């Protein structure tokens, strides 16, 4: 009887859950990461335009999305300097959309964003991954204030 009960318990026991575990993104952490990077970054507040159909979809079952998909986009807005978001920015950029297993980064077409754009020579690239951190959709005023404070050398610690 004990064996039957143990067998039934084993059958109904929850299977291991697979989930993506990420540190909650913050503009302060993103600024610190970009500031410490060897590459040059530009912080831009603007409108992101892209072909959303070109974005990878998350995987399911045996079908997994590619680890990296490059998508052309346009970012139109203002980049950050010591005075704030003052420098016009109208550039074609490459979204580098990463997938971690079945989870893929995502952005929406036409969305107002705060983006940490990497500059490589004359080209611009934006990392988009499932954990976030390089692009913030519909940024709140507090986020814009925080990144301006970071740029000016003020307190740049996440809450």
Where are these regions (language model features)?
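Positively charged n-region of N-terminal signal peptides that target proteins for export
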Residues: 1-4
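Bacterial N-terminal signal peptides
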Residues: 6-16
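Transition segments tied to proteolytic processing and entry into folded domains
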Residues: 18-159
